[in-house]
Structures are given as C-alpha cells and as structure tokens.
Swiss-Prot record:
Its EC number is 3.1.-.-. Residues 236-246 have a biased composition (Basic and acidic residues). Belongs to the LCL3 family. Pfam families: SNase (PF00565). It is a single-pass membrane protein. This is Probable endonuclease LCL3. GO terms for cellular component: membrane; mitochondrion. It comes from the Eukaryota. It comes from Pyricularia oryzae (strain 70-15 / ATCC MYA-4617 / FGSC 8958) (Rice blast fungus). It is an enzyme of class 3 (hydrolase). The chain crosses the membrane at residues 39-55. Residues 76-234 form the TNase-like domain.
C-alpha cells in the first residue's frame, strides 16, 4: 500500500507528557567522557595540591623549634639569617625558606630588632664541636672562650647559613651541621673552629651528632693540637670544655648532698 508523504505511521500517537524539569535534572554523562572537558580540571586540581604541598614542605617559615615536624630531622635543612650569637657553639636563626628567590631581603624583610625577633627564631647548637665555656652562673670563663665567641660572631653573624638538622636537644635547641658561604666557597662552621683551635670535637658519651663527619673533625683537631693553635697553645694544664662541665657538675652535686 502506497504511503502518502503527509501520512503518519500507525505507531505515531500521543507521546506521554514529560515533567518540565526532567531535562534539567538529567546528567549528561557523555559530556564527561570527552577528555577536553575533564582533563583541564584534573590538571588544575593536581597543580593546586602540589603547590600547597610544596609550600608546606619548603616555603612555609618555621618560627621556632617547636614548629619543626619530627620528620624533618635528618632529612631536611634550614636556611636562614643568623640574628645573634650567644656562645662559642650556638646561635639564633631566623628561618628564610627559599632565600632570595622567595623574596627575602628584597620583598620580605628580615627583622633586626630584638623585640621584633622575640619568639621568631630557632636556637641552633653546632653539631660535633664543643667550644670553651664562657663565664656564667658564677662559674669562671675558660681560656679562649672569648676568642671562640668573637670568631663565631665575625664568621656568621648577619649572614645566611644552611643548617642540616639532626635532633632537638634538652635545651630545646636544634643540633645540626652549619654551612656558610665565604666568597665562592661553602664552609663547615664547626670544622673551621676546630681547625683554629677554638673548639674541640664533642666528646659526650650520649647525644653526640656528627652527620658522618666525626673522622674529619678528629683529624682536624689532631692537626690543631700539633700546631698548638688556639686553646692547644695555652700555658698550664689543659681542661677541655667537656671536662670543665663535668667538674662543675660534680661540684654542684656535692653541694646538694
């Protein structure tokens, strides 16, 4: 039977009415199958998450010892400006993550006043060395304690240093090997003090940290002794910083007993 162009199929009949918002709530999954529709979003999300993680790990400033994550020790280093030197083997560091590339010293200022620095620096104990003890708590100063302090000030105060951190000590200081750039060379601060006879190799029975440099430190100490440099050339009976501390600790215990 011939079908007229304007005729309709017998199956064509009234269509069931659709709810007005059916098409609004329907998810077009075909849209998400197209890479061009979801790849940019995935890349943007991944980039943002990576940037946040990078900032938290490498660019977030650490204002004090208590803010250092335990996982950082023996894995990370701290870069910053030395703001004060309190003794022959310790100082305070203002953490400047990223250095000049992150804007420090030209876009972001580093405080210099003591009041502005309060609670914002990290105390650092130089690993592997022991400098002569200065006078404090009513105790006499050791020979060459003033020279050791003066050398450390002239060598690192106001300079940027990198500290490879190992642990936190009983005084809430960070123990680490400290490096400073002098002209075009990077110098191990502790090693330079030993070479000049201004510090001994750290000889405590527990808590000694060397970062794999103990042999190098002891060789440098032997040379300084042989040349009678610094404290090794002093007259009279030699008392190491460790022996000095042990003597005063024994005296304090005897007074309490």
């Amino acid at each position: 039977m011939m079908r007229w162009p304007w005729s309709s199929d017998s199956s064509d009949g009234p269509k069931p009415a659709r709810h007005w918002n059916e098409s609004l709530n329907k998810t077009d999954w075909e849209h998400y199958k197209e890479p061009r529709n979801w790849v940019p979003t995935a890349i943007a999300t991944t980039t943002i998450l990576a940037a946040v993680q990078f900032y938290r790990s490498y660019l977030r400033r650490i204002p004090g010892t208590n803010y250092i994550h335990p996982g950082f020790f023996r894995r990370r280093s701290l870069f910053g400006r030395v703001t004060s030197v309190g003794d022959g083997d310790n100082f305070h560091l203002f953490h400047t993550p990223g250095g000049r590339l992150a804007g420090w010293s030209w876009l972001r200022s580093i405080p210099t006043e003591r009041k502005a620095l309060k609670g914002k620096t990290i105390p650092v104990r130089i690993a592997g060395v022991d400098a002569p003890e200065a006078a404090h708590f009513g105790r006499e100063a050791q020979p060459f304690s003033a020279e050791a302090l003066e050398f450390l000030k002239s060598y690192i105060l106001g300079r940027d240093v990198r500290t490879y951190i190992y642990r936190r000590d009983q005084y809430e200081r960070v123990v680490g090997t400290v490096w400073v750039r002098r002209w075009l060379l990077r110098k191990d601060v502790g090693l330079e003090m030993i070479k000049r006879g201004l510090a001994t190799v750290y000889d405590a029975k527990i808590g000694a940290e060397f970062g794999g440099l103990e042999e190098k430190y002891r060789a440098a100490e032997a040379k300084a002794k042989l040349k009678k440099l610094g404290m090794w050339g002093a007259k009279g009976k030699f008392e190491s910083p460790r022996d000095y501390k042990n003597r005063h600790a024994a005296t304090s215990e005897s007074k309490l007993s």
